C-alpha cells in the first residue's frame, strides 16, 4: 500500500489579524504546520505535497526538504488547492491523505486509523468526521437510511434539516489517488461561496456508485481548526494538557500541572519533581531525580540528574549531575557546569565552563571564563570581560579561592590553589599557590570622625 499526503497551507488566515501566515502560528513551541506534518508522518507517505500561497517562502522554510511544494496563487477553495498538487501526484497508484495545516491537535494515531479504515473498507473516499455538540459553521455529513455517506453539505448551503445534524466534516480525507484527480476535473463553483469545494467529489463518487465512508474521531478536540486567536488559545490548552499527561504517565510529578508550560520537544526523565509556574522550552532535557521549583525557566538546555534548580533562568546551557542553581540565578547561553557545582543567589554566568564542585554562592558575574574544579568564588566577584569593543577570557585554576568583592580584569589567569584577597582588583597573572592582594592599604585616623557634621557630639 502506497500512501501520499497533501497538506493545505496556502491561506492567509485573515481572522488571526497577523502578518504571519496562519499555519506558522505556534502551539507548544512548534508551528501548527509542524504539528500536522509530524502527525502525517505516521502514515509513512511516499510523497508529501504542501500547498503554499500567502508568504510562501516563510511557509516553505519550515518544512524545507521534508516536503514537495506547489503554489496556489489564488485561494479559490479547498478543491482548487488540491488541484494544485495534480502535477506531483496525478496518475499514481495509492491512497492520498488531504489535511489542513491549521489542525495542530490531530494525532498520528488517528490518521493511521483513518488510513486503515479506508483500506479495510475498500473505499474510494473516506472522510474523517466528529460529533459536535454545537455543529454551527461546520460542513455536515449527510447519510442515507442505511447509514451510508451520501454527501457533505457546507453550513451556508445546508437546509434546515441538514443544519440539525451533529456529525461534522473535520476537513481531513483519504482518497483513491487516481480517482481524486479525475473527480476534481468535474467540480464547479456553483455554490454559496463561489469556490471549488473539495467536498463536492463525494457526490461525484456516489453518483458513480463508488464507496464513500466516514471514520469518526474519538476525541472531538482533534478536529479543531484554528482560524483565530481564541481557537489558538484552545489548541494551546489542549496541547499543554496532553504534554503534561504524557510526562506524568512516564513518571514525572507535577505539583500544579495547570500552571506549567512545557513545549513539545522537551524531554523529562522519570522521578523529576516540577513545582508550579515552571516553563520548559525548546530542546530541553531534564535528568532523573531533578527538582525544578516554582518560577524556573529553562530553554534549550540539558539538566543533569539529581540537580535542584530554584526559581532561576537557564538558557542554552549544559549542567552535569548534582548541580544546584538559585534562587534567582541566570545561566546564559554557552554555560557548562560540572558535577555538583553550586550557583547561588543572584549569580549570572555567561559563556563559561565551571568545573566540578566549584561554588559561586552570591552576587557574582562570571562571563567568558574557564573556572576549574573545587574553586570558591566569593560574593561580589566580577569578571571584567569587555573593554567596549572585545571580550576577553578569565581562567581560574583548580582549588583557587577568589575572595569576596574581587574584580578580575580579563584577559587574566589565576593559577591552581591561588588566593585573591577580598576587595582586590586583579589585572595581572596570579601564579599557582600564590596569595595576591590588589587593594589600597587601610589608613585609620583615630578621633577624626568627631570633626564631621553628623557625629552625635556636634549636635549638643
From Swiss-Prot:
Region spans: Linker: 230-250
Pfam families documented for this protein: Hexapep, NTP_transferase
InterPro entries: Bifunctional_GlmU (IPR005882), GlmU-like (IPR050065), GlmU_C_LbH (IPR038009), Hexapep (IPR001451), NTP_transferase_dom (IPR005835), Nucleotide-diphossugar_trans (IPR029044), Trimer_LpxA-like_sf (IPR011004)
Annotated GO biological process: cell morphogenesis; cell wall organization; lipid A biosynthetic process; peptidoglycan biosynthetic process; regulation of cell shape; UDP-N-acetylglucosamine biosynthetic process
E.C. designation(s): 2.7.7.23, 2.3.1.157
One GO MF term: glucosamine-1-phosphate N-acetyltransferase activity
Pathway the protein contributes to: Nucleotide-sugar biosynthesis; UDP-N-acetyl-alpha-D-glucosamine biosynthesis; N-acetyl-alpha-D-glucosamine 1-phosphate from alpha-D-glucosamine 6-phosphate (route II): step 2/2; Nucleotide-sugar biosynthesis; UDP-N-acetyl-alpha-D-glucosamine biosynthesis; UDP-N-acetyl-alpha-D-glucosamine from N-acetyl-alpha-D-glucosamine 1-phosphate: step 1/1; Bacterial outer membrane biogenesis; LPS lipid A biosynthesis
SUPFAM superfamilies in UniProt: Nucleotide-diphospho-sugar transferases, Trimeric LpxA-like enzymes
Chief location of this protein within or outside the cell: cytoplasm
Co-factor requirement: Mg(2+)
Top-level EC class as recorded in UniProt: transferase
Active-site feature positions: 362 (proton acceptor)
Gene3D superfamilies: Hexapeptide repeat proteins, Spore Coat Polysaccharide Biosynthesis Protein SpsA, Chain A
Cellular localisation: Cytoplasm
Binding-site list for UDP-N-acetyl-alpha-D-glucosamine: 8-11, 22, 72, 77-78, 139, 154, 169, 227, 332, 350, 365, 376
Key words, A-Z: Acyltransferase, Cell shape, Cell wall biogenesis/degradation, Cytoplasm, Magnesium, Metal-binding, Multifunctional enzyme, Nucleotidyltransferase, Peptidoglycan synthesis, Repeat, Transferase
Cofactor note: Binds 1 Mg(2+) ion per subunit.
Ligand binding (acetyl-CoA): 379, 385-386, 404, 422, 439
Catalytic function, reaction form: alpha-D-glucosamine 1-phosphate + acetyl-CoA = N-acetyl-alpha-D-glucosamine 1-phosphate + CoA + H(+); N-acetyl-alpha-D-glucosamine 1-phosphate + UTP + H(+) = UDP-N-acetyl-alpha-D-glucosamine + diphosphate
Region (N-acetyltransferase) location: 251-460
Disulfide partners: none
PANTHER family: BIFUNCTIONAL PROTEIN GLMU, NUCLEOTIDYL TRANSFERASE
Physiological role: Catalyzes the last two sequential reactions in the de novo biosynthetic pathway for UDP-N-acetylglucosamine (UDP-GlcNAc). The C-terminal domain catalyzes the transfer of acetyl group from acetyl coenzyme A to glucosamine-1-phosphate (GlcN-1-P) to produce N-acetylglucosamine-1-phosphate (GlcNAc-1-P), which is converted into UDP-GlcNAc by the transfer of uridine 5-monophosphate (from uridine 5-triphosphate), a reaction catalyzed by the N-terminal domain.
Subunit and interaction comment: Homotrimer.
Name of this chain's protein: Bifunctional protein GlmU
Amino acid at each position: 500500500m502506497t500512501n501520499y499526503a497533501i497538506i493545505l497551507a496556502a491561506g492567509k488566515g485573515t481572522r488571526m489579524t497577523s502578518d504571519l501566515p496562519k499555519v506558522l502560528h505556534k502551539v507548544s513551541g512548534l508551528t501548527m504546520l509542524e504539528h500536522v506534518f509530524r502527525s502525517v508522518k505516521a502514515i509513512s507517505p511516499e510523497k508529501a505535497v504542501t500547498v503554499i500561497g500567502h508568504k510562501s517562502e516563510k511557509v516553505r522554510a519550515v518544512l524545507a526538504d521534508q516536503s514537495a511544494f506547489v503554489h496556489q496563487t489564488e485561494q479559490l477553495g479547498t478543491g482548487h488547492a488540491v488541484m494544485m498538487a495534480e502535477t506531483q501526484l496525478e496518475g499514481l497508484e495509492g491512497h492520498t491523505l488531504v489535511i489542513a495545516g491549521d489542525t495542530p491537535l490531530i494525532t498520528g494515531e488517528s490518521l493511521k486509523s483513518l488510513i486503515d479504515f479506508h483500506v479495510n473498507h475498500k473505499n474510494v473516499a473516506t472522510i474523517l468526521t466528529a460529533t459536535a455538540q454545537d455543529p454551527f459553521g461546520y460542513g455536515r455529513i449527510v447519510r442515507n437510511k442505511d447509514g451510508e455517506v451520501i454527501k457533505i453539505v457546507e453550513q451556508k448551503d445546508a437546509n434546515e434539516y441538514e443544519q440539525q445534524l451533529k456529525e461534522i466534516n473535520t476537513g481531513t480525507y483519504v482518497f483513491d489517488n487516481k480517482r481524486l484527480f479525475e473527480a476534481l476535473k468535474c467540480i464547479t463553483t456553483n455554490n454559496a461561496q463561489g469556490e471549488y469545494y473539495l467536498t463536492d467529489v463525494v457526490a461525484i463518487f456516489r453518483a458513480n456508485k463508488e464507496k464513500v465512508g466516514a471514520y469518526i474521531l474519538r476525541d472531538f478536540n482533534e478536529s479543531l481548526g484554528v482560524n483565530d486567536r481564541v481557537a489558538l488559545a484552545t489548541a494551546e490548552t489542549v496541547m499543554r494538557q496532553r504534554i503534561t499527561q504524557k510526562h506524568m504517565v512516564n513518571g514525572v510529578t507535577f505539583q500544579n500541572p495547570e500552571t506549567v508550560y512545557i513545549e513539545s520537544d522537551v524531554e523529562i526523565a522519570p522521578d523529576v519533581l516540577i513545582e508550579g509556574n515552571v516553563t520548559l522550552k525548546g530542546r530541553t532535557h531534564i535528568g532523573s531525580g531533578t527538582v525544578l521549583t516554582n518560577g524556573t525557566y529553562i530553554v534549550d538546555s540539558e539538566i543533569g540528574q539529581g540537580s535542584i534548580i530554584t526559581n532561576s533562568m537557564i538558557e542554552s546551557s549544559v549542567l552535569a549531575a548534582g548541580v544546584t542553581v538559585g534562587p534567582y540565578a541566570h545561566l546564559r547561553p554557552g554555560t557548562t557546569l560540572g558535577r555538583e557545582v553550586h550557583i547561588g543567589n543572584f549569580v549570572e554566568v555567561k559563556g563559561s565552563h565551571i568545573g566540578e564542585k566549584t561554588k559561586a554562592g552570591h552576587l557574582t558575574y562570571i562571563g567568558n571564563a574557564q573556572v576549574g574544579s573545587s574553586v570558591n568564588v566569593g560574593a561580589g566577584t566580577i569578571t571584567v570581560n569587555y573593554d567596549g569593543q572585545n571580550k576577553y577570557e578569565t581562567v581560574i585554576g583548580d582549588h583557587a579561592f577568589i575572595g569576596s568583592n574581587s574584580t578580575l580584569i580579563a584577559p587574566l589567569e589565576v593559577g591552581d590553589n591561588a588566593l585573591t584577597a577580598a576587595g582586590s582588583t586583579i589585572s595581572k597573572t596570579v601564579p599557582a599557590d600564590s596569595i595576591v592582594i590588589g587593594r589600597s592599604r587601610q589608613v585609620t585616623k583615630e578621633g577624626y570622625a568627631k570633626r564631621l557634621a553628623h557625629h552625635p557630639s556636634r549636635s549638643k
